[in-house]
Amino acid sequence: MAFGSPRNNSILAAAGFPRKVSTVAIAIGGLASFFVFGLLLRLSYPNSSSVGGIFYGIGNPEQVHVPLSLSNHTVNILQKSSDINAFDKNLTSDSSSGLPVVVSKSIPPPDFSSDRKLETPLTQEKEDLVSSDITEKTDVQSGERETNVSKAEDTPSASSPPDDVSETASAEPECDLYQGSWFYDPGGPLYTNNSCPVLTQMQNCQGNGRPDKGYENWRWKPSQCELPRFDARKFLELMKGKTLAFIGDSVARNQMESMLCLLWQVETPVNRGSRKMQRWYFKQSSVMIARIWSSWLVHQFNEKFDYAPEGVTKLKLDLPDERIMEAIPKFDVVVLSSGHWFAKQSVYILKEEIVGGQLWWPDKSKPMKVNNVDAFGISVETILKSMATHPNYSGLTIVRTFSPDHYEGGAWNTGGSCTGKEEPILPGKLVKNGFTEIMHEKQATGYNQAVDKVAENLKLKLKLMDITEAFGYRHDGHPGPFRSPDPNKITKRGPDGRPPPQDCLHWCMPGPVDTWNEMVLELIRRDRKSSST
């Protein structure tokens, strides 16, 4: 076996040496060239983002898209401004433009529903998940109104509040709170169905088995300002030593419970209620939240009157509910709401004369002067004038406008349904509800007539919280068939296509109804600011 001789080894060693020297020389030269190139590049492009763009393909931070998966929503942190209004559409919603009066004649449901003549059923088609902000622009001169739904796939869009907006900030004093858009807020609600013990079971949608939760995350953004998230501590501070009362029907109860749920997260109140009035007392701030049931807000009785027999509800439309008038000296802020009970059977009386009725008019020979929507408008004017001129009440009165229902395809008892609605209605796809529109119009007219008839100093204490149009888009916010925790309840359509019994009037909690109390807080803040200046 032969191994290499020393001579051969020395030759190989001599041959390898110059290669090492050349390799080192080349490496040093290359490194020097790299530094020279980098120095020249730095001098030529002083903006570091430009250098990053050359090496990494990133020109500006604004071009970086960071996708966040939120259920079925994909959120792009930053987007090109040209994409924001890619799907803008116009929608005119002037409720007074030749709208026919629609008077409900069907049997109203127990406790909650307002039957009405329904428009063509709406079928909401699923949009591609890579969607964008869908906007209805406001043209002030042409009278068009804006209602905009900002999809989370494009958030934050022009209608979404920036992430760094303080939750305790306040909207601008002159900003219109009621024209704006719904946007998806990944932050979610401020409470859950498990953290609020006063939540009525019918509105406990998650506790009743509703499978989706996205409806809890949509928040309202006014077009010209921010509406801050509800700040319970700020509310209790503003209302220290004072009482807020909700007066109305079961939808007023819905709003009152929402307020309690929001406040319960910072302090547990004491129940001081009675059979006549619900009252919850927050000791640390001496704040009272109260509720009075008043279906029509005016005087009602059941005794025989003229040719109207005993047992039929009679309403004296020109007299306020005496229970309200007795209680309001104790209140500092009152939120009034009504309307849905005007679909129920009742007799209307003005100046001690029967002038009309709902689902009751036996004497066909006499003309009916007042129908149910007219009666609603008169009742609003009556209660507001009475409260504004009450000698012992000087509080802030907020009229929350008519809350829309979303029974599609029929009434509550004739196959109407809101099953399967998981997102707000998109602009341009809203089916107008004639009964809701005319009820809203009559309510606003009654409010304006009351304001016109009171002294100037009293006008400032009357506020219209105009939620009707914005909440027309929230067909996703109702319990639907998830009205009870019964594990055997029917939640899907039967073989014949008929939907199960459901509630498409009240609102899930947490849910859209919490926005009403964000607005209430803002109106109270504005009132306090106005009073102090």
From Swiss-Prot:
**Composition bias, kind Basic and acidic residues: at what positions?**
113-154
**GO MF annotations, alphabetized:** O-acetyltransferase activity
Q: Where is this region: Disordered?
A: 93-171, 475-502
Q: Where is this motif: GDS motif?
A: 248-250
List locations, semicolon-separated. Membrane
Listed under GO cellular component are: membrane
Give the protein's function: May act as a bridging protein that binds pectin and other cell wall polysaccharides. Probably involved in maintaining esterification of pectins. May be involved in the specific O-acetylation of cell wall polymers.
Family classification: Belongs to the PC-esterase family. TBL subfamily.
What name does the UniProt record give this protein? Protein trichome birefringence-like 18
Gene encoding this polypeptide?
TBL18
